[in-house]
Amino acid sequence: MAFFTVALSLYYLLSRVSTQAPVVQNHSCNTADGGYQCFPNVSHVWGQYSPYFSIEQESAISEDVPHGCEVTFVQVLSRHGARYPTESKSKAYSGLIEAIQKNATSFWGQYAFLESYNYTLGADDLTIFGENQMVDSGAKFYRRYKNLARKNTPFIRASGSDRVVASAEKFINGFRKAQLHDHGSKRATPVVNVIIPEIDGFNNTLDHSTCVSFENDERADEIEANFTAIMGPPIRKRLENDLPGIKLTNENVIYLMDMCSFDTMARTAHGTELSPFCAIFTEKEWLQYDYLQSLSKYYGYGAGSPLGPAQGIGFTNELIARLTQSPVQDNTSTNHTLDSNPATFPLDRKLYADFSHDNSMISIFFAMGLYNGTQPLSMDSVESIQEMDGYAASWTVPFGARAYFELMQCEKKEPLVRVLVNDRVVPLHGCAVDKFGRCTLDDWVEGLNFARSGGNWKTCFTL
């Protein structure tokens, strides 16, 4: 942490001396295996707007397959790649920048770029950077599980959003590219086998929408607004002093911080140029921002929401079905028509890949109890990732996030389950976990009582 503090402080000192956006000369800091390691002192604290970066080094347990074991099954659950802002946010960002340009009477130092900044970001779709992320993800998946991928074609599903489907397709491109370089592979090119519509009334385990009480709950919005009201005023005052003539809200402050990530991800195909928006803010402010995003996800979709984990029950029960090769037992968000048909939900595959959104993935992780060690997050002060027991939006659901659910066969007869989130081994809960973070399959499934019992899903439809 001391190195982080010194490095980040140095970065901000230098960024305030120069008005030029930092640039790396090549994209060796952005690789398929390590993810986005460019400008890590800032890019790794953007919450869910961080691009995927491997956190293998943060794991107390090696991600390598233990000696004497082999992986016999893998399910990857992935978020889509980096995207442009949503349509509503894109309009808000553009309007804010126009207002600053209209009202500010001077632009100096790190703010000079704002005077002539032209907002050209699109809305909702993947950026080229995001497309490349998913190509890298597919290639990494093939190489990591080559022994299985050589002989098995993954069964692939995607939630129906354009950016999610496009992410699945780019993942396939990367998988196929690695496959073609492996002369030992004889399998056909994968395809997106199932696209689950994101429409009202259509059950979809990869996108929440059907739990009425959950969708109408505004508690997380209130918690986010309260924390923004704590961190926002000092930043707002400083920006208003530095840019005379402007008036900002606390929400405006967060929007300007959002632009750091979105502008960076849109500038180049590999993220080699850091947006000048980033240098407007300090180390402390970025840590507050990162925590704000984690807070929002925890109380919006995780254990901090009464019905957050319930949104992940359906997928959890689908994973149980795949691991045990038995019919899906679920009465929550699963689509019975799809899940009862071997053509749309086979149970005999060795490789599965599903593509989703950050919010749904948070719910799934908490439905599985992966972060049961995380205590309720403070609503008024920043906690470290260590204090949150490894939970953070940037560590769990960055753009291009991926969780690997592995089944291993070792010397003993009974298979073992292991879970990695962005390359970090997450020790399992609710079962007898070994030194490698694993539990036997039967023990882990038995420990998933919340999901197997349907949790509190029935309260979704109570007034």
From Swiss-Prot:
Post-translational modification: Seems to be cleaved into at least two pieces, most likely due to proteases in the supernatant. The N-terminal fragment, called phyB seems to retain phytase activity.
Taxonomy, superkingdom: Eukaryota
Entries under InterPro entries matching the protein: Acid_Pase_AS, His_Pase_clade-2, His_PPase_superfam, Histidine_acid_Pase_euk
Cellular-component GO terms for this entry: extracellular region
Record field: pH dependence: Optimum pH is 6.5.
Biotech exploitation of the protein: Phytic acid is the major storage form of phosphorus in plant seeds and, thus, in seed-based animal feed. Phytases are therefore of considerable economic interest.
Cellular compartment(s): Secreted
Glycosylation sites: N26, N41, N103, N118, N203, N226, N331, N335, N372
Cited Pfam families: His_Phos_2
Catalytic activity as recorded in UniProt: 1D-myo-inositol hexakisphosphate + H2O = 1D-myo-inositol 1,2,4,5,6-pentakisphosphate + phosphate; 1D-myo-inositol 1,2,4,5,6-pentakisphosphate + H2O = 1D-myo-inositol 1,2,5,6-tetrakisphosphate + phosphate; 1D-myo-inositol 1,2,5,6-tetrakisphosphate + H2O = 1D-myo-inositol 1,2,6-trisphosphate + phosphate; 1D-myo-inositol 1,2,6-trisphosphate + H2O = 1D-myo-inositol 1,2-bisphosphate + phosphate
Disulfide bonds: C29-C38, C69-C410, C211-C460, C260-C278, C431-C439
Entries under PROSITE patterns matching the protein: HIS_ACID_PHOSPHAT_1 (PS00616), HIS_ACID_PHOSPHAT_2 (PS00778)
Residue spans crossing the bilayer: none
E.C. no: 3.1.3.-, 3.1.3.8
Principal place of residence: secreted
GO molecular function, one term: acid phosphatase activity
Keyword rRNA-binding: no
Enzyme class (EC, first level): hydrolase
Signal peptide per UniProt: 1-19
Binding positions (1D-myo-inositol hexakisphosphate): Q48, Y49, R79, H80, R83, T86, R163, D207, K297, H357, D358
Assigned keywords, A-Z: Disulfide bond, Glycoprotein, Hydrolase, Secreted, Signal
Keyword Endoplasmic reticulum applies: no
Function: Catalyzes the phosphate monoester hydrolysis of phytic acid (myo-inositol hexakisphosphate), which results in the stepwise formation of myo-inositol pentakis-, tetrakis-, tris-, bis-, and monophosphates, as well as the liberation of inorganic phosphate. Myo-inositol 2-monophosphate is the end product.
Subunit structure: Monomer.
Annotated family: Belongs to the histidine acid phosphatase family.
Name of the molecule in the record: Phytase A
Species in which this protein is naturally found: Emericella nidulans (strain FGSC A4 / ATCC 38163 / CBS 112.46 / NRRL 194 / M139)
Gene: phyA
